[in-house]
Amino acid sequence: MNGKKLYISDVTLRDGMHAIRHQYSLENVRQIAKALDDARVDSIEVAHGDGLQGSSFNYGFGAHSDLEWIEAAADVVKHAKIATLLLPGIGTIHDLKNAWQAGARVVRVATHCTEADVSAQHIQYARELGMDTVGFLMMSHMTTPENLAKQAKLMEGYGATCIYVVDSDGAMNMSDIRDRFRALNAVLKPETQTGMHAHHNLSLGVANSIAAVEEGCDRIDASLAGMGAGAGNAPLEVFIAAADKLGWQHGTDLYALMDAADDLVRPLQDRPVRVDRETLALGYAGVYSSFLRHCETAAARYGLSAVDILVELGKRRMVGGQEDMIVDVALDLRNNK
């Protein structure tokens, strides 16, 4: 690591939305954001689980609007930057401007790993606003390291100053992560940062994040108690403990994070965020982690196994945004019984 400080990016209040069907109250947001700020994380991402304007029939309606959540977090932080997520085609530059006015200072512009070209307008506008602008290549396991690097180079060209490898499915292992960071490092400018967003579906969220840092990664996403889609993200407090053991600089208070995870976040989980039969199937089959709750609903409705639905979605190589296909797959499986 050469003595550099890691940038710690918390995603409890965005990816964690998936774990409770986007139902954080404003008071939940204030309490969690304040605890994270007191623990000195660098940024706190806030939005519907599917990003700005994700609240919809397809993805699930949120308890509040993105702007209400962002304002609630911005009101209580003194150190951390408020971040948000935007998926082109769901969120617009108008939504981005509103998020900026509400207090967001970092935006991660997210596309499928082979579709970076749809991010140009949003990345350019974010730079015009003066935002810390990040390219976020979702489902990075679905293309080769070399092709991922080409997509990263496109985002860099549009103006992104940091590019993320995003294991949306929790499907990659440490070798997969190393290969992708080496490919990015070979083509990106030295000043362009890289980041890692892990999911814990194969219990490799922390290990993959460590592998990323060993390959020069600058920013690590994690969440309190792993609060996130599927089996969750890399648990923040666990990653920080491991980073301490490795002698890495991160600037955060481990014990404050441990308290926040157990006292504030874990009690909110109506379904435990953990590796179990269904979440393991996500990682094994390579399925978008936020499909979990939708699949469980469909399985209950049609008298099916959620694992069977998830495995079939993996076979069909469904990607984020195709939540509407979950019911189609369930009906196909029921009719073929």
UniProtKB/Swiss-Prot annotation:
Binding positions (substrate): 14-15, 168, 197, 288
Q: In which pathway does it act?
A: Aromatic compound metabolism; 3-phenylpropanoate degradation
The record's disulfide annotation reads none
Catalytic residues per the record? 18 (proton acceptor)
BP-aspect Gene Ontology terms: 3-phenylpropionate catabolic process; L-leucine biosynthetic process
Record: residues binding Mn(2+)? 15, 197, 199
Residues annotated as site: Transition state stabilizer: 14
Q: Which domain of life is it from?
A: Bacteria
Q: What's the Enzyme Commission number for this chain?
A: 4.1.3.39
A Gene Ontology molecular function term for this protein is: manganese ion binding
Give a yes or no for keyword Manganese in this entry.
yes
Q: What is annotated about its quaternary structure and interactions?
A: Interacts with MhpF.
- What family name appears in the similarity comment? Belongs to the 4-hydroxy-2-oxovalerate aldolase family.
Role, per record: Catalyzes the retro-aldol cleavage of 4-hydroxy-2-oxopentanoate to pyruvate and acetaldehyde. Is involved in the meta-cleavage pathway for the degradation of aromatic compounds.
The protein, known as:
4-hydroxy-2-oxovalerate aldolase
Q: Which organism is it from?
A: Escherichia coli O81 (strain ED1a)
Give the taxonomic lineage as stored in the record: Bacteria, Pseudomonadati, Pseudomonadota, Gammaproteobacteria, Enterobacterales
